Amino acid sequence: MSTRNSQSIRSSCDRCRSHKLKCTVSPEDSRSGPHKCTRCIRAQVTCVFGPRSQSKRTPNGKNKPEKPKPELEPPQKTSPPVCSSSLAGMDLGSPGAWTPWIDDLASQETEEPLPIDVNTAGDGSGPSDGDFWADLGMTQELNMLELAPTNTYQAQYLASFDYVAPPVAEVGHLMDISEPSEHTPPHAIVQLSTLVTKIHETSKALEESPWSNVPDAKQLQNYPIGRVLSLSQDFCSILGCIWGKVSISSDGQSSGSGSSPTPSADMLDYAEVLSSIKITQDPTASSSMAASVDMPTALLVLSCYTSLIKLYSLVFAHFENHLSHLPEIPSPYPSQAALASHRWGLQLGELPSADETCTKICTAVQVLLDAFQSVEDVFGLPRSFSAVRQRTCDMEGMDFSAELGRTSLWTDYMVHFVVRSNAIRADTEECEEMRELSTKVRSLKALIREKMNL
């Protein structure tokens, strides 16, 4: 091109140089006139080819008189006035009028500035802009809308994001949020899940133990009643924590407007439970009993309760099996004739003791029943619904409204879903388990009295 022959004029116009774009000069015989690049012609702006700055170095190493350098405005300042001055003669309604603005916006937002050598910048001996783009193989004109951020820019962005992320993670707000998780329902759910697993493991170990086979008084001495007691006490402690939180929540709701809030889909409302079992709720207790029970927690509580019933039934069956196979021994108590002939100074300590095995089994049964009764007390189960009391299976003809009016939400939930609906029909496994435990308790007590001649 003719502009390349003259070293005093740059090979790229000021507009293309400011955007680091390839400048293609139009043919001189075109109607647009000489020395105009195709980009400026398309944008309908003035195309200016600025003079080069003369090199300070000479081939012979001699200093030449310096020529005054023309003061060039920065490219960032010259390009906007050129574009703005052309608005007066542009037809803003035509689609082609907005092409330069799209090119400018795309180049400013997506084009990455290329590195410039400060030693050769502004030096006439350095390669020209046209030669630089030609060396890169950019022989065709670029479409600015197809440009995308380079990997270097993305790496810098990701590096800056990674730098900001650690301080956010190190802030103590996350620890403050996670600290109360130990007192939230998920923590109770974890405890109940672990407890159910331990109960099932204990039941399986007792079923596979030698105590289930031929009864032996010596083996019975090593019976692990401590594990059963520990499971009952752990269950009672967990229930105490859960019921305490529900009571606090109920008190907090009753202190509000006095109306029961609408529970979520996974919550069981007290009024819904009572309406499902056709019991009229006391209107004076509507605000205080409006607490809701978390469904997973309630199901785990019921699972622990039924699993504990199975475990107790298994333990009492082992005790009954050993007692029934004990040999018949004469009564250790003296007859009335022997007592009459005895001297006047007979003392309590001189009386013979009963069978040691029967005494220990009786003590173990009493301790286990006390622990299980503590669990039912936390539930608030009345005597009519107790699994270890005499009136457990006598369900027909009972007034449930009289019992439920003085019980807790846990009681009503269990009565409807476990005790009442199943005990009356007597067609489910849960009912059979509760009946079996109650029957085991009564038969075991009768057998102990028989063996001890009580």
Curated annotation (Swiss-Prot):
DNA-binding residues (ranges): 13-47
DNA-binding among keywords: yes
Full protein name: Trichosetin biosynthesis cluster transcription factor TF22
Keyword terms: Activator, DNA-binding, Metal-binding, Nucleus, Transcription, Transcription regulation, Zinc
Gene (UniProt): TF22
Ranges of compositional bias, category Basic and acidic residues: 63-74
Function of the protein: Transcription factor that regulates the expression of the gene cluster that mediates the biosynthesis of trichosetin, a trans-fused decalin-containing tetramic acid with antimicrobial activity. Directly activates expression of only the three biosynthetic genes PKS-NRPS1, DA and ER, while TF23 and MFS-T are induced by the final product trichosetin and not by TF22.
GO CC, any one term: nucleus
Annotated compartments: Nucleus
Domain of life assignment: Eukaryota
Listed InterPro entries: Zn2-C6_fun-type_DNA-bd_sf, Zn2Cys6_DnaBD
Polar residues compositional bias, start-end: 52-61
Transcription in keyword set: yes
Molecular-function annotations in GO: DNA binding; DNA-binding transcription factor activity, RNA polymerase II-specific; zinc ion binding
Cysteines engaged in disulfide bonds, as pairs: none
Residue numbers spanned by region Disordered: 51-89
Taxonomic source organism: Gibberella fujikuroi (strain CBS 195.34 / IMI 58289 / NRRL A-6831)
SUPFAM superfamilies from the UniProt entry: Zn2/Cys6 DNA-binding domain
